[in-house]
């Protein structure tokens, strides 16, 4: 238990390592979060602690494990780190999200509206779920680089769990910096409130909860 003379620990936020296409969102997020007093780990800004005896994957996943809060951003780029010889390999960004969910990290999530629109359209065309989408051949584009972005969104909202069991499934839609910035501002300017929440609910480690099924 912290005494009156102890200096409060600075809260650390890990921002998911997606970069391409949302640079302005990341810049705005970094400026806002640092202005509120958080230590921000963001690969885009070079502020994520890295060590030369670890791979890029390991450095990013270790950041997720050690941070206090995870800010996940699902953009239109699936991310790097995919093994071209293994069609089932996942990007760093996807693995970060899964790690945050597995650890039940206190998290806030943003998803580009292109991802949500594409999911809705494909569902109406009879391509609901990861297995159905995996049969499709999507041409890479700036609109939506990879259909596994939809998989990420569905994992974030716990799509496979019964509605009554879904907790921590709020995902905010955004299109650009003008949409993302107000959400980040309204959520994270409550520094003391968030610190108290973490102290109350996570001081003995994250609670156990039902996990989203992986495809």
Residue ranges of predicted features:
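Conserved catalytic or regulatory cores that recognize and/or transform ribose-phosphate-containing ligands
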Residues: 1-215
